[in-house]
Regions:
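Cytochrome P450 core scaffold surrounding the K-helix E-X-X-R motif
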Residues: 43-49
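Hydrophobic alpha-helical segments typical of transmembrane helices
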Residues: 5, 47, 56-59, 68, ...
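Glycine-rich beta-strand-centered segment in the early N-terminal region that forms part
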Residues: 22-40, 52-95
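Conserved hydrophobic/aromatic beta-strand scaffold that supports enzyme active sites
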Residues: 18-23, 69-71, 103-105, 111
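NAD(P)H dinucleotide-binding glycine-rich loop of Rossmann-like/cofactor-binding domains
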Residues: 90-153
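Residue-level signal for nonpolar/aromatic packing positions in well-ordered secondary structure
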Residues: 3, 70-72, 85, 114, ...
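Short N-terminal binding/cap micro-motifs at the start of the first secondary-structure element
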Residues: 10-16, 42-43
Length: 153
């Protein structure tokens, strides 16, 4: 399958290339997602630039990406809650990465069904930034009816 891989650390437009890699092996708790959209987040850009080498050492070449949306095309025996053909989105675990590929195997517990009223692109853009926003609001103790100011966006 095709995968967008980081070949060496550097500039975003100079160190990535499409390579053929093996299709992921589906474990019993996994669903195999045919990728329709994947996001590149600030953490991916920091990894590409080499800024996180000390914290996240990864062997190169590496398939990056944490956020994905697509269609379930296979599932393990213990992957409850999903059927072949389900439209889904997910954030893969920190140690996994690899959503910038044609397929990604993800533990079913990290996957959700895609809301029907959003596109694959919108769904792929939600997991990491949505989690960050939610954690931030929870951290500062925002409650129902509190007012906040959101800059930009």
């Amino acid at each position: 399958m095709k995968s967008l891989q980081l070949l060496e650390y550097g500039e975003l437009n100079e160190c990535l290339a499409f390579n053929e890699i093996d299709k992921p092996i589906v474990r019993s708790q996994d669903v195999l997602i045919e990728v329709k959209a994947a996001a590149i987040n600030p953490i991916d850009k920091s990894i590409i630039a080499g800024n996180l080498r000390a914290l996240l050492p990864i062997p190169l070449p590496a398939t990056l990406g944490y956020d994905v949306s697509g269609v379930v095309v296979e599932k393990g025996a213990d992957a409850a809650g999903f059927e072949i053909g389900d439209l889904v989105y997910a954030r893969v675990p920190q140690e996994q990465m690899g959503t910038l590929a044609e397929f990604v195997a993800v533990a079913a517990e990290a996957v959700s069904k895609k809301p029907a009223n959003i596109s694959f692109e919108e769904a792929a853009g939600l997991p990491l930034v949505g989690l960050t926003a939610l954690q931030s609001l929870n951290h500062v103790g925002i409650k129902e009816h509190d007012k906040i100011l959101i800059h930009a966006g």
